[in-house]
């Protein structure tokens, strides 16, 4: 599947742009107020005691600022940040090399921590609890274990799939934070801030139009801002106001709900081919010529969160809201947009 303009996964362009607009302090980290307030207390307490802050688990959908928050935490603590990801740490020795190079109170950030191998996890447990690791030296009968002391450090683990974490690993995090989708008002503030940093001429109304189509996700909001900037430079002398933002979104085929053509095609397929559902995910994937994982991880979450799609024990169903969005008359027995319990698919 081609990269979607409203995909919440990161691209190289996103990574490069994020580096320039990423907030450095909690005061500049917009949204997620409960998380910010709690982290401010934890950070100040750790600094006052002169200790490493407790280990932190951050989870939530992609694009909400987990990596950004880890940078902010390290900056607020005044320590260095080492960044890696679960799939990169293939062997216990890889993790040992990272840990032994940390300075006291440093922050180690592991993205996609749910993808750590069991062997690596076993090494991580004593490192998190006792700041020690056991390394095997030699092979066969001559092999022996050496215990290495580590400096006190803070591990920040980030994941989009908290349910895949093993219980022993999850229990070793003293601080657990869930990031929620952002409101249009919060995203508007983020777009205005990003536009100012990037030198983009954008009115509050133009920023609000971009924000309301960004699916509650800062990464998407910033990506849409860059594409609208391109449109404005060619069509509107670089000025982004409400009409320019709307015209750019029409060109990008992102509707007012933040849906692109793939979202609309999925809803339309359920309505036209399966009478609105329920339909099993395998049948739906075959009809759309998409992989099951793409439907479950990329397309469905936002449709469900916004009340356009529900999952039942018998499969996927669209709601009245979906019919109205497609300009169709809903059947009388159609669900109004509230999910049903049970999901076996």
Swiss-Prot record:
Mg(2+) binds at residue 67. It is found in: Cytoplasm. It is an enzyme of class 3 (hydrolase). ATP binds at residues 21-22, 63, 66-68, 129-131, 172, 182, 219. Its main location: cytoplasm. The keyword Calcium does not apply. One of its GO terms (cellular component) is Holliday junction resolvase complex. GO terms for molecular function: ATP binding; ATP hydrolysis activity; four-way junction DNA binding; four-way junction helicase activity. It catalyses: ATP + H2O = ADP + phosphate + H(+). Belongs to the RuvB family. PANTHER family: HOLLIDAY JUNCTION BRANCH MIGRATION COMPLEX SUBUNIT RUVB (PTHR42848:SF1), PTHR42848. Has 3 domains, the large (RuvB-L) and small ATPase (RuvB-S) domains and the C-terminal head (RuvB-H) domain. The head domain binds DNA, while the ATPase domains jointly bind ATP, ADP or are empty depending on the state of the subunit in the translocation cycle. During a single DNA translocation step the structure of each domain remains the same, but their relative positions change. This is Holliday junction branch migration complex subunit RuvB. It comes from Xanthomonas oryzae pv. oryzae (strain KACC10331 / KXO85).
